[in-house]
Regions:
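Start-of-helix register in tetratricopeptide repeats
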Residues: 14, 48-51, 85
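Short coil turns that delineate tetratricopeptide repeat
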Residues: 44-47, 81, 115
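Canonical positions in the second alpha-helix
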Residues: 39, 75-76, 109-110
């Protein structure tokens, strides 16, 4: 068990999310991602984890983990195909990773959803 896991084990899921949100707001993106990874590993099948999944994807992007952001954005879109923010994050993460053909396909998906990238 990692330090973060042991620290979070006694907290309620919402407390873990709130703490991750504070870390994100403080630009501690890697730590926020670690807390959210723990939260989703423990409670990912619970209803209402969409905000945590989105914050996780958002945490990966500025922490220079574009492919993890891509994977998270795709997971969000599997659950919620109309999530405009996830489409934008997918496009930008693919661009950042140098995956121009995939980014172009994601841009077409964004246009189909009426999302301006």
């Amino acid at each position: 068990m990692t330090h973060i896991e042991s620290m979070l084990a006694s907290r309620e899921p919402y407390e873990v999310y709130q703490w991750a949100r504070e870390l994100f707001d403080g630009r501690e993106y890697i730590e926020a991602a670690q807390a959210l990874e723990y939260l989703l590993a423990e409670h990912g099948d619970t209803m209402g984890t969409g905000a945590a999944r989105e914050l996780l994807a958002r945490s990966y992007y500025p922490s220079a983990q574009p492919m993890r952001a891509v994977d998270s954005a795709r997971e969000i879109l599997e659950r919620d195909p109309g999530n405009a923010y996830a489409v934008i994050l997918l496009v930008r993460s693919l661009q950042r990773a140098g995956r121009t053909k995939e980014a172009a396909a994601a841009e077409r998906m964004a246009l189909a959803l009426g999302v301006e990238v």
